[in-house]
Amino acid sequence: MTVEELIVYGKGKTSSDHAKMLLSSYLDVNPLELLTILDKEVDSDIEKLYKSSLEALKENKPIQYVIGNVNFYGLKFIVNKNVLIPRFETEELVEQVVEYTKDLNKDKIKILDLGCGSGAIGLTLKSILKDSEVTLVDISKEALEVAKLNANNLNLDVTFIESDWFSNVKLEKYDIIVSNPPYIRTDEEIEEIVKNNEPSLALYGGVDGLDCYRKILANIKPYLNNKFLMAFEIGESQKEEIYDIVNKYLKDIEITCKKDLYGRNRMIFVRNKID
């Protein structure tokens, strides 16, 4: 079958966008490039893979898991059922952290990524901040295996620790500690495709969604350098509660909440107060 015939076939199984996304991924081209190769005959093995993937989509599997990777900040990350699918909004968190490093005036920045999942945040920071020392932490051995594959594919030299937050992390000082922890309430309604496919360990943060923030902030102080930044992704309604938790454990700080591109409170930044 030709590219055009497969696109038409795919539209009968899923959305036009998903059909093109799948096919372009397997042909290793940009979706827009499909229009330039509509008459191209597609290898039979790719055709079979494409058709089987369309069936997986009909079973309400996330397209990122079906393809097996996702683009994040211009980098390709392997994803599977053991890791949360990196969201576009998290790229904004990375951008803000990179911007902050300009104020540090320091060559070798030490960064800790807590609950790293696929490694999207920590590995992206390492790819941008070449001289930084990055440590990625996750409680899930399976998630760390995915993160290690991504580090290898991206040729990034980082450290991995299997740990329940700080429990196995050696006491060292970090300039930046970043985390996108589970923050969904246990009784919160979420999309079926998310609930049925992405790891619950990476989604749910207890009755009020704040358990992980409490655990992190209760133990974070000894790991902070004299000049530091903490960066968290949060649920859009959690700003005030997290401010309270931060202020319970840390003094002489500045807290900033930033909105994402959709105008939602989604990022909190904590740094030492500058006189």
Regions found by a protein language model. Give the residues of each.
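Conserved SAM-binding loop
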Residues: L136, G205, A231
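Short loop/edge segments at beta-strand edges and connector loops
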Residues: I67, I161-D164, I234, K259
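Residue-level signal for inorganic ion chemistry
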Residues: L22, N60, T90, I121, ...
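Conserved Class I SAM-dependent methyltransferase catalytic core
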Residues: D208-R271
